[in-house]
Amino acid sequence: MFTEDMRIADYDPELSAAINAEKRRQEEHIELIASENYVSPRVMEAQGGVLTNKYAEGYPGKRYYGGCEHVDVAEQLAIDRAKQLFGADYANVQPHSGSQANAGVYLALAKPGDTILGMSLDHGGHLTHGAKPNFSGKIFNAVQYGLNPETGEIDYDQVERLAKEHKPKLVIAGFSAYSRVVDWQRFRDIADSVGAYLIVDMAHVAGLVAAGLYPSPVQIADVTTTTTHKTLRGPRGGLILAKSNPEIEKKLQSLIFPGIQGGPLMHVIAAKAVAFKEALEPAFRDYQQQVVNNARAMADAVKARGYKVVSGGTDNHLFLIDLIDKGVTGKDADAALGRAYITVNKNTVPNDPQSPFVTSGLRIGTPGVTTRGFKEKEVVELANWICDVLDNMGDESVVEKVREKVLSICRDFPVYRANAKSGAAL
C-alpha cells in the first residue's frame, strides 16, 4: 500500500539530487536546442499520473485487457484532437517516439530491401531518413538527396533525378536541420511520377503547421509523421497522421500494434491529449508566430556580426550557423557556449570537412526561449552574446561575462513562474 506523501527526496537522495540539479539547469541556462521545449504543468500532471499503471494493448473499444474504459476515453480524446488540430482523417497516437512512428510507416508500406529516398543526414535530414547507422539505412536500400550548394535549399531537381533513376517505394520529405519552407506538392509530384508513396516527417515544424504558419503536408502526403514535443510543446512521443485511405489506415494500425509495439504508454497518450488541447487555443498561434519572429531576428543579428547562416535565413523555428570560414569547430563552439550557460548543439553543415562528432556548424532553435517569454529584443541580445563568445574563443573572461548576463535574464524570465496562490514554483 502507498501513501500520497511518499517522495523521491526522502527515499532516493542521489536521484533526487540529479533531478533537482536538472531543474536548476533548465531555469538557469538558456535552451537553444531546436528539438527541445518546456511542457506545461498540465502535461506533466497527466504524464505523472495513475494512467501509467494501466496496460491497454489494442485500440479504443478493442482491447486485449479489461478495465480499459477510462483509458479508452483518454486515447480517443487524443485521437480526435490530433485529427482536428492537423486536419487529418486518421491519427494514431500510440507511437512511443518519432523514430517509432517512422519505423511503423516504412514497414507498413515497404518491405526490407525496397528502395527509399530521403534527405541526407549531413544536409539536414534525420537518422530515420536512410542514414547508414540507422535501421532505415540497414534494412532498406537508402538513396539520399541534399541541398543545392548555391542556395542552401533543397535541390528538387536532384530529388526528381534520383527518383527517376532509383524508382523508390517511399519518398521521404522532412528534416531535422533545415530552415526553409518545404514544397510538399513538388515532393508529391515527384513521388507520383515514379509510383512511390510520399511520407512526410514534420516533427520539427508540427507546432507551426498546427498554428497555420507553415504549409501543412497532411492532405498532400500519403502519411505524415511527427513527434509530439519540439514546437508542438507536448510530451516526448510520436504521432502518425494520414488523409483518408482505408487500406493504408489498416496497414498502419496493425503495424504499430501488434507489429512493432505492445502496450501503449497511456500516461503519455493522456499528456498528448492535453498538449493537443493547448495547441488548439488561440494563444498557441501567437506563441508560434513569436517563435518564427525570434528565429528570424536571431539569424539576422548573427549575420550582422559577420557569421554565415545556411540558406541565408529562416522561415521556421531554427537556423544553422556555418563556422567553416571562421576556423571554429561546432564541437568547440558548443562547449564554449555551454560554459556560458547557453545550450546549443553542434551540427553538420553542407560540405562540412569535419566528422559528425566534430562538425563545422551550430543549430539554433527558438521554441524554448519563446516559451520563457523572450521576444525580439531579448533574442537579439542573446545572438550578440553568442557572437561575443565565438569571436573570443579561448577567452574565459568573455564566457564568464556572458554567463552572468544569462543568469540575470533567466531570473527575469523563469520557465515555471511561482504560483500566484501558493507562491511556489514548480
UniProtKB/Swiss-Prot annotation:
Residues modified as N6-(pyridoxal phosphate)lysine are 230
Amino-acid biosynthesis among keywords: yes
Check the record and name the CDD domains matching this protein.
Answer: SHMT (cd00378)
One cellular component term (GO) for this entry is: cytosol
Q: What class of enzyme is it?
A: transferase
Q: Provide the GO MF annotations for this entry.
A: glycine hydroxymethyltransferase activity; pyridoxal phosphate binding
Source species, domain of life: Bacteria
Q: Where are the transmembrane segments?
A: none
Residues reported to bind (6S)-5,6,7,8-tetrahydrofolate: 121, 125-127, 355-357
Main subcellular location:
cytoplasm
Q: Which is a Pfam family this sequence falls into? A: SHMT
Q: Which GO terms describe its biological process?
A: glycine biosynthetic process from serine; tetrahydrofolate interconversion
Cofactor(s) for this protein? Answer: pyridoxal 5'-phosphate
Q: Which PANTHER family match?
A: SERINE HYDROXYMETHYLTRANSFERASE (PTHR11680:SF50)
Question: Its family?
Answer: Belongs to the SHMT family.
- Report what the protein is called: Serine hydroxymethyltransferase 1
Source species of the chain: Hahella chejuensis (strain KCTC 2396)
Its lineage opens with: Bacteria, Pseudomonadati, Pseudomonadota, Gammaproteobacteria, Oceanospirillales
Give the gene name: glyA1
